[in-house]
């Protein structure tokens, strides 16, 4: 009966209109404050279907990356809860992660945020048997600063200087697809970032290296880019810039501009239910 309820919930989640997910239902299991980094530093929350999955059926997994300008934010923010819950309702294991923020260490923290998020992918692969996931089917989604990080995970590889130095043998950080919610594509055209440890004028190279658009000419994992026209924090032109660079490179991507949507929306902004779009994209590349 519980499995039937899960199947019905998953099917219902694909159809609009549906009441916004604001609380975690009993059909979703959440494990909080899981250690995934060396030492007792950043932690993660795991969302998964509560219904038992047959041993032969491995779940796809998605890393969720919070925003906050690389200065603040948390894995347990409302947007991340909404995304994690909706993913679990649709048959995914979702891992909402924290990463090093500006001010937590002396000087610059970059590229620490990228490395932490890539280590989350490594942790999923290392623990795939215990988690019941397919290590070949891992995606990523993030909003704002998290969107920037999601795009970097999709676009960068071993030669780009973002790989953790302590990678286990036979384990890599590649993701199969990424969803970038209103992320910064070109840091040089945005504003100075505390995480970089210098201004754009003083060290333009670090800003260029931290910009997803820098890597758009490479072979990339498929990207879904979402941005609202009412965003006053990150100009929608940032997403258009990344989409154009990906188009010019012949990379698989989709740009969706949502009229009237502000910054920090989740999968269910009042302007449009984005679950069919986002879940459909993930299903195509991870199932």
Feature-to-residue mapping (PLM):
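N-terminal cap/lid segment of alpha/beta-hydrolase-fold proteins
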Residues: 16-56
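Short substrate-entry loop that stabilizes the transition state in hydrolases
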Residues: 52-59, 65-106, 148, 188
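C-terminal catalytic histidine-bearing segment of alpha/beta-hydrolase fold enzymes
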Residues: 45, 107, 236-287
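Primarily recognizes the serine-hydrolase "nucleophile elbow" in alpha/beta-hydrolase
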Residues: 119-192
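Acidic catalytic loop of the alpha/beta-hydrolase fold
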Residues: 186-187, 230-234, 264
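Catalytic nucleophile-loop/oxyanion-hole region of alpha/beta-hydrolase
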Residues: 35-36, 74-83, 95-135, 268-273
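Short beta-strand/loop motif that positions the catalytic acidic residue
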Residues: 219, 225-227, 231
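Mobile cap/lid helix-loop segments that gate and shape the active-site cleft of serine hydrolases
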Residues: 20-26, 39, 159, 167, ...
């Amino acid at each position: 009966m519980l499995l039937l309820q899960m199947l019905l919930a998953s099917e219902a989640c694909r159809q609009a209109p549906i009441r916004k997910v604001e609380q975690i239902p009993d059909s979703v299991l959440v494990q909080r404050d899981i250690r995934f980094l060396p030492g007792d530093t950043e932690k993660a929350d795991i969302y998964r279907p509560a219904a038992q999955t047959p041993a032969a059926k491995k779940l796809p997994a998605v890393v969720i990356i919070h925003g906050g300008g690389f200065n603040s934010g948390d894995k347990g923010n409302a947007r991340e809860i909404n995304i994690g819950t909706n993913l679990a309702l649709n048959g995914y294991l979702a891992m909402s992660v924290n990463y090093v923020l500006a001010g937590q260490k002396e000087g610059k923290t970059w590229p620490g945020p990228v490395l932490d998020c890539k280590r989350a992918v490594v942790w999923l692969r290392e623990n795939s048997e215990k988690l019941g996931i397919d290590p070949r089917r891992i995606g990523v989604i993030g909003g704002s600063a998290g969107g920037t990080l999601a795009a970097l995970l999709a676009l960068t590889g071993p030669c780009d200087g973002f790989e953790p130095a302590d990678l286990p043998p036979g384990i890599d950080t590649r993701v199969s697809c990424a969803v970038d919610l209103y992320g910064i594509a070109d840091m040089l055209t945005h504003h100075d970032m505390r995480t970089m440890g210098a201004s754009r004028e003083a060290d333009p190279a670090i800003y260029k290296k931290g910009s997803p658009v820098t890597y758009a000419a490479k072979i990339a994992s498929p990207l879904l880019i979402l941005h609202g026209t009412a965003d006053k924090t990150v100009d929608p032109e940032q997403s258009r810039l990344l989409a154009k660079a990906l188009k010019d490179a012949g990379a698989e991507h989709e740009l969706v501009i949502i009229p009237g949507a502000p910054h920090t929306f989740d999968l269910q902004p009042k302007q449009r239910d984005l679950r069919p779009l986002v879940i459909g994209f993930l299903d195509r590349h991870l199932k």
